[in-house]
Amino acid sequence: MRQSIKGRALRHFTLSTGKSAGRNSSGRITVFHRGGGSKRLQRKIDLKRSTSSIGIVERIEYDPNRSSRIALVRWIEGVLPGRQRKFKTIEEFALPRKILESTTATIFCLFSFSSLSSPLAQGETASLSFGSSLGFPRIAVAGAKPAFFAERMREKKIGKKTFSLCEIRKWRTHCVLWAHRIKRKAALSWQSLRQQKTLELVGAAEHNESKLKADQGSLLPRQVLAYALCSGRPSYLHASRSFYKALLPVEASRFGSLPAKPPIGEGPKDGAYKVDRAPVTYILASHQLEAGNMVINCDCSKPSKSGFLRPAQNAHTYLRFQELGRTVNKGRVEGGSQLAASWPRPPAYRHEILDLNSKVGNSIPLADIRMGTWVHDIECHPGQGAKLARAAGTYAKIIKEPASQCLVRLPSGVEKLIDSRCRATIGIVSNPNHGARKLRKAGQSRWSGRRPIVRGVAMNPVDHPHGGGEGRTKGGRPSVSPWGKPTKAGFRAGVGVGKRRI
């Protein structure tokens, strides 16, 4: 497997983690010879792979926190929520060439500014759908960085409808920043309109209030009270009724014309500021998985509508029906063959589809995997995520025909029964030569966070019970820890424990 690393990991899928240096929460050393090491960023790995979609491997990257490699996958399906493609035949599965390009991606997003009060922003709606050209409204382009939006305008003239993977970082950053900035502009425009209306209401209220000679000492600030009455907040209902009576008859018609204030932190309900999820994720790379290969996720909880991706829509029910048919056929006689032939039978297993799905890197249920197949990233419970066989070069083997429970031989040699609805990834975990590597110098061990191991006889008497003395001697006592506790297997038990047994 060639390791194609171009640039750093995506910032959206990285997070920083602290180091404990072998200490627990109370500060005591629980694991010796740990500490130091180079700085690392944790990668967010999609171990569940719950999205029923097809993806293309963009590149294979190095992960300093695990022994295997990781793959950056760009998902073709599943980016648009609520839309799924139907593939009835194998010929319809042929994808366009522009989708199979390893450096392109398409993101869905919708901007709507019909609710804004600005005359330039009203009625402007720019939609970015699957395969449509990138377009942004004026309010989003105004004041933007030329390095990001200038390329989009040039591509619009040229006719390019996708953008490169290197701009996904910019898209994630700018999409969130512009969402907050657009919200801020909308709030400012709404506040300016509300302040203008409030001043008019306050002026009319002052004119009517002077006639009624209301008690001014029991009133709240007029602007705040007028703002509360306009927005319809019930927290100011305990205020003086004279101000409300003076305000309501004059400007009662204006209350219905003013727009209601949206809750704090929420925008319009048409999805104007909704940011779609990223079209790429990190997964554990399989051996012989290279950039440009296609991988498939088959989700049992959300069966795909396509018969091409899921040969058995309900494999668990089909296997139970198959076992029932075998039990009934054991007592069948020759004369009843015609009667048995008329019984309903499940559809024949399409082995050509299973061979197509059983490619390296595909995540499919154990019920759809043939006997003798090498798998990794196995789930213990359906939908839990990969738990078994995740280290570099490890794999498990299917050693029994799929039934309600599948028998799997783990890398340790233990045979375990796992629910057939659990999913596993075809192939072996990448980087199988991880165990054969050799450290060229002591610094490589320190880079990995391992501190040197020092023998007790090489220390001083103040540091260890075995320290001191002339030459390599430990004073004739058995091996003990730095605190004087026995460390050999025969000396760990208390004195006289075996004699107490009757």
UniProtKB/Swiss-Prot annotation:
GO terms for cellular component: mitochondrial large ribosomal subunit; mitochondrion. Keywords: Mitochondrion, Ribonucleoprotein, Ribosomal protein. Residues 493-502 have a biased composition (Gly residues). It is found in: Mitochondrion. It comes from the Eukaryota. One of its GO terms (biological process) is mitochondrial translation. Residues 463-473 have a biased composition (Basic and acidic residues). One of its GO terms (molecular function) is structural constituent of ribosome. Residues 458-502 are annotated as: Disordered. SUPFAM superfamilies: Nucleic acid-binding proteins, Translation proteins SH3-like domain. PANTHER family: LARGE RIBOSOMAL SUBUNIT PROTEIN UL2MZ-RELATED, RIBOSOMAL PROTEIN L2. Belongs to the universal ribosomal protein uL2 family. This is Large ribosomal subunit protein uL2m. It comes from Oryza sativa subsp. japonica.
